[in-house]
């Protein structure tokens, strides 16, 4: 497993972080919002950095960078609320490069703004587009054709929105258009771009959520009430801690999906909409909680947090109800729906737990298949009620109850990765780990701090699978366990 960025990726992230901290500072974001959600100077600066050519194939003059590189850039875009259809322009340029269009140079140079149409224009010629208020070019699908649409002011209708995200309702049927390509190969490229858009949007929402929580945490350290910083109150600090954990999980979710696509995992297609749904949900809820941390100030336009709240709510609505992403994932998992996946390029991060972890997981899986009779399966429950002394004892005898312990103590000396893989198998079989988890906590404390007598009378029976332990309440009135 390797979840670290390589030197080139770290440099890429740092470069865009510095650039956007300067060129998409909140004063610039507010000014762009007044202009309908677009900053021409920022757009040109992004073009000069090579942003729009990063996913263009090398043979078309692009940088041929990977999806994960684009995701890193989009995290910074979300963090700084950078204006314009940036993910859409990156993928539009990729399509133009793949299809050999002469319009590519205009897009990568920043001379023209390009975006994507999400719906087949054959059945829906009029549709809302991300960046449609400012786009010059749109790449759309029309049946088995991929179309390049040139928009004029007469082809669009713009309505002000509180989020100032630059959406526009565009009449693609009326606008001038050119057929870029036709046939399955062309439409597959377009569909792959749509899937990659979901991942890049998920990354942007993740960056937004991370910054919203950071703003709230900083304010909670500065704001005092009753003589102390409000961040010392658990009612404020614990929700923020929960959300930054979910934000971190959202980032790893996006990276893991990219890794799964690159490695050909069977569930990769279903994971794409799930990653977007998760990050959209977390961004919305994290922004709300962060805004509430500011109290009434959070609702005023003077505080930047309200900008994050508005953008978090509006960003995904261009695609429709985010809950539909769950339906799409379900169809891909259980109904055989096929998706065309993007070529992600090289992926340095690696979520593989290793051969040792796979071997231990396979052994635990075989144990449960051999041990869990229909009666035991009926007994299974996710709570303590699912504990069964006989199965608990047999796991201990097989050295699978506490595999992280040394062989001398009845375990396997398993690595944390292997222990995690083994625990996941318990979940797969619906077998509760409550008794195991709490008992292991007590066993670890006794092993480290207990007397010889306590180890003999309590620890040894624990390791043998003869007894289980629970934790008492040290502060019953406060709910601490």
Language-model regions, residue ranges each:
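Phosphoinositide system proteins, centered on phosphoinositide phosphatases
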Residues: 13, 90-91
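Short, conserved phosphate-binding/catalytic loop or strand-edge motifs used
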Residues: 438-443
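Alpha-helical interface subdomain recognition
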Residues: 1-80, 99-102, 110-111, 183, ...
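FAD-binding core of flavoproteins
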Residues: 81-87, 94-214, 218, 228, ...
